[in-house]
Amino acid sequence: MKGTLRQRLWLADGMLLTVALIWGSSYAVAKQALLFYPVLGFLAIRFGLTFVLLLPQLRGTGRRALRPGLPLGLVMLAIFLCETSGVMLTSASNAAFLISLCVVITPFMEWLLLRQRPHNMLFLACALSLAGVWLLTGGPQLSLNLGDALMLAAALLRAVLVCLTRRLTAGREILALALTAVQSGVVAAGCILLGVSLPGGLPALPVEPGFWFGTLYLVLFATLFAMFAQNRALGRSSATRVSLLMGSEPLFGAIIAGLWLGERLGPMGWAGGLLIMLATLCTLSIGRQPAPSTAGDGAPARA
């Protein structure tokens, strides 16, 4: 019996570590895909494919996701416009570290929107993350470029999305995949409308295999497999182990960006990234502890 439980624990940990690795690699993959097609077209294809694959989830009780999914999809549209444009304009390493700030920002957004005061330790995590951003963006020679600013905006919007998801889905039985389907449809439709309204519209679909391999990787692995693996593993691993494994995502992002794209972070950049990771791990470990009053597990799916 103990051997079986240990095997299940290792399997759960392996799945969570795989998800962190996939999500960490997604920044470099997206950066490469954007070499072949503009942001709006790339997002329209990526989320259009996700919507088509998840469409069966909207049958029966899945339709309950329509009402909350539409406004949440609009927020998600803003997130990915900022995030994907940010990935294009900054390094994949910076993008991976900066977007993880949403974990630290979320408790303070809950304080603002849901009137839930954060744990005192989270103020320390916030200070660590701010120091990390300062080091990551140049330290004394602060050079926050447009891409970094867009990634920070995306992190802030992700925190807003978490709070809105909890508020709009509280007390409702809504399938996570159905909610992701609606949100993906809204993002795809929004990008198509924005794209065709611009002068010249969207260019012809790219023919480069690298674009399609990258896009399919993001759809099949960064969204569908990641959701399956995360849902299957979360109930089998301890909160501390989950926090440590999922908090490794930005580290994987920086390593993959270095190996694949040739990006190099200096000592100051690595110090800043590690401070952000430390703040993220602190927030995750505190956030997973039982509390007398919670808003429920309404965090939106990563797409």
Language-model features, listed with the residues they occupy:
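C-terminal-most transmembrane helix of multi-pass membrane proteins
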Residues: M1-L5, L9-W10, L43-G48, F211-F213, ...
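C-terminal transmembrane-helix exit sites in multi-pass transporters
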Residues: L53-T61, E83, C102-L124, L251-A271
